[in-house]
Amino acid sequence: MSADAAAGAPLPRLCCLEKGPNGYGFHLHGEKGKLGQYIRLVEPGSPAEKAGLLAGDRLVEVNGENVEKETHQQVVSRIRAALNAVRLLVVDPETDEQLQKLGVQVREELLRAQEAPGQAEPPAAAEVQGAGNENEPREADKSHPEQRELRPRLCTMKKGPSGYGFNLHSDKSKPGQFIRSVDPDSPAEASGLRAQDRIVEVNGVCMEGKQHGDVVSAIRAGGDETKLLVVDRETDEFFKKCRVIPSQEHLNGPLPVPFTNGEIQKENSREALAEAALESPRPALVRSASSDTSEELNSQDSPPKQDSTAPSSTSSSDPILDFNISLAMAKERAHQKRSSKRAPQMDWSKKNELFSNL
């Protein structure tokens, strides 16, 4: 995209709403065949109208988080989790179409880039993150630390007349138990529980590796109140990169540090060396075990003790050599045993004497 085209491109709108006695005063809906969530209706005199929200606007971000690929319930949960104020980045249909033709990705940085002094080409500069003006990426970075501090959340709720107001499900593609949906105005919603959250703990007990029935039983065992430690998708991925299971210590304490590629390679090499050290004697153990088994099987045919007949020059460090010698010895002993079972030779004079008696 050329700089001239970017400079003349329309911009999205940032609407900051403060909740009134009757809420924010707008209705959200999804349209068939279109990705995303749209403003269906804006009530007259409402905080939404005062903030400049318009019917037909497409919702792009909620409090700096992109929601273009999220479900209706997920977007609603994000808005309600903001409590008394919310920041919505929206585009009207005409602006949305023009930005798509120009290949400009809709985000809040476009507005900050335009407001930055001495910035001749705001959209172009916003497109190249980390290049150009040094101040702009710093401003963008400053807007995310709160949102990017990925911590688990402790959701405490008391059972209402209709229960807690959330549904639990498991996903075959990934381990764990997840929140499928949260009912509006339910105890679960009031506690901050969101759709797609993964349950880590129930009432202080870790649920890692537990089955669906185990998690349900743990929740029911809490009676009319339960505490769920949960992580959203991004937080879950962060802790997996750190190789740490989230806990209540991470609610306010220091966060773990993700493994870098070098550290992962070092860790893998250490594990490989440890495994090699453990596995390296195994072939010898297998051979010696099979040798012992052969000795036991052969000993059934050769009762004599083996210690007295084993050659002293044989090295015990070579199980293969021991195995070959034991076979040879076994054959010799078997031959000796068969020979020892034969009847002694009788001379002809004794035979004649025996037959004459009969």
Curated annotation (Swiss-Prot):
SUPFAM superfamilies, sorted: PDZ domain-like
Domain of life: Eukaryota
Biased composition (Polar residues): 288-306
Record note on modification: Phosphorylated on serine residues.
InterPro entries named in the record: EBP50_C (IPR015098), NHER (IPR051067), NHERF-1/NHERF-2 (IPR017300), PDZ (IPR001478), PDZ_sf (IPR036034)
GO-annotated molecular function: beta-2 adrenergic receptor binding; beta-catenin binding; channel activator activity; chloride channel regulator activity; dopamine receptor binding; growth factor receptor binding; identical protein binding; PDZ domain binding
Major subcellular site: cytoplasm
Chain positions found as Phosphoserine: S2, S46, S162, S269, S280, S290, S291, S294, S299, S302
Subcellular localization: Cytoplasm; Apical cell membrane; Endomembrane system; Cell projection, Filopodium
Residue list for modification Phosphothreonine: T293
Disease: Nephrolithiasis/osteoporosis, hypophosphatemic, 2: A disease characterized by decreased renal phosphate absorption, renal phosphate wasting, hypophosphatemia, hyperphosphaturia, hypercalciuria, nephrolithiasis and osteoporosis.
UniProt name for this protein: Na(+)/H(+) exchange regulatory cofactor NHE-RF1
Gene for this chain: NHERF1
